[in-house]
């Protein structure tokens, strides 16, 4: 037998959870750098377990296993006891305890936490995308986006982009301004990936005045004038009509309400369904 301690990490998924716990525990034993881990991932049958125990036969081993399959975990326990291996079952007692108290049966599916982690990183990627391409900073992002939101100023484009990015959707928003040509990329993508936003003239007049005031500017500036708002609104509606994209009037709608409408449109059109 080797004197060096080897910690066997046995999992029906990657084994990252068990390894993290093992590392936390070993930090309480400084000076034992010769102890090391050996990880066995995707152990989902008794045959695979037997291969692990065969490899353990010539080593000083401490077994740590995270197996959501109750029968497989029970088999691993019995094998450890019959071979006199020290072991700890990381999941069974906790899962059974929660199930007993809550009255809810566990899913029994390995790798769920890892899938949740993947979802988290996808969400972060989508949020970073929305920030990078906010307010039409780089129209080339249109070709990479799951969704393109277009509209004139103060139609909730940015907050909607961020809200939808949190749903794992890569969103770019493009401001429509009469003096600025429409990005050519808008005509290179499926119009079902584009959502146009409009607002009532009166509401736009009010929110733009508030915006000007917050910037320390006069509320009588052209930006908030009814004539300018009407000009922009007509221009935007013409662009949206030519593109053939769905149009949503966001007047008196909360961000969440508009986002729900957008998600339903995307689902109906079969767009970015993988993210929803």
Curated annotation (Swiss-Prot):
Sorted keywords for this record are: Kinase, Nucleotide-binding, Serine/threonine-protein kinase, Transferase
Class of the enzyme per the UniProt entry, highest EC level: transferase
InterPro entries referenced in this protein's UniProt entry, alphabetically: Kinase-pyrophosphorylase, PPDK_reg
E.C. no = 2.7.11.32, 2.7.4.27
Q: Which residues bind ADP?
A: 151-158
Asked if the Swiss-Prot or TrEMBL record annotates the protein with the keyword Lipid biosynthesis, the reply is: no
Q: Name one GO molecular function term.
A: phosphotransferase activity, phosphate group as acceptor
Query: What catalytic activity is recorded?
Result: N(tele)-phospho-L-histidyl/L-threonyl-[pyruvate, phosphate dikinase] + ADP = N(tele)-phospho-L-histidyl/O-phospho-L-threonyl-[pyruvate, phosphate dikinase] + AMP + H(+); N(tele)-phospho-L-histidyl/O-phospho-L-threonyl-[pyruvate, phosphate dikinase] + phosphate + H(+) = N(tele)-phospho-L-histidyl/L-threonyl-[pyruvate, phosphate dikinase] + diphosphate
**Any coiled-coil ranges, and where?**
none
Asked if the keyword Kinase belongs to this entry, the reply reads yes
Q: Which family does it belong to?
A: Belongs to the pyruvate, phosphate/water dikinase regulatory protein family. PDRP subfamily.
User: Which PANTHER family would you find in this protein's record?
Assistant: PYRUVATE, PHOSPHATE DIKINASE REGULATORY PROTEIN 1, CHLOROPLASTIC
Protein's job: Bifunctional serine/threonine kinase and phosphorylase involved in the regulation of the pyruvate, phosphate dikinase (PPDK) by catalyzing its phosphorylation/dephosphorylation.
User: What's this protein's name?
Assistant: Putative pyruvate, phosphate dikinase regulatory protein
Taxonomic lineage of the native organism: Bacteria, Bacillati, Bacillota, Bacilli, Lactobacillales
């Amino acid at each position: 037998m080797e004197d060096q301690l080897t910690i066997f990490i046995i999992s029906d998924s990657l084994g990252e959870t068990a390894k993290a716990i093992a590392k936390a525990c070993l930090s309480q034993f400084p000076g034992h750098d010769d102890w090391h881990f050996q990880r066995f991932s995707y152990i989902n049958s008794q045959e695979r377990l037997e291969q692990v125990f065969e490899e353990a036969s010539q080593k000083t081993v401490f077994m740590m296993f995270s197996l959501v399959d109750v029968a497989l975990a029970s088999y691993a326990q019995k094998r450890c006891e019959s071979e006199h291996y020290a072991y700890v079952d990381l999941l069974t007692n906790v899962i059974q305890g929660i199930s007993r108290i809550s009255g809810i049966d566990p899913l029994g599916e390995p790798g769920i936490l890892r899938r949740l982690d993947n979802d988290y990183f996808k969400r972060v990627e989508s949020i970073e995308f929305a920030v990078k391409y906010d307010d039409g900073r780089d129209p080339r992002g249109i070709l990479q986006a799951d969704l393109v939101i277009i509209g004139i100023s103060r139609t909730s484009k940015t907050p909607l982009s961020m809200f939808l990015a949190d749903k794992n959707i890569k969103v770019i928003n493009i401001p429509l301004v009469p003096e600025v040509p429409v990005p050519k990329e808008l005509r290179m993508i499926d119009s079902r990936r584009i959502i146009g936003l409009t607002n009532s003239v009166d509401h736009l007049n009010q929110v733009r005045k508030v915006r000007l005031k917050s910037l320390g500017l006069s509320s009588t500036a052209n930006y908030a004038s009814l004539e300018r708002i009407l000009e922009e609104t007509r221009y935007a509606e013409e662009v949206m009509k030519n593109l053939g994209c769905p149009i949503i009037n966001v007047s008196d709608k909360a961000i969440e309400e508009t986002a729900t409408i957008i998600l339903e449109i995307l689902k109906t059109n079969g767009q970015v369904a993988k993210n929803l």
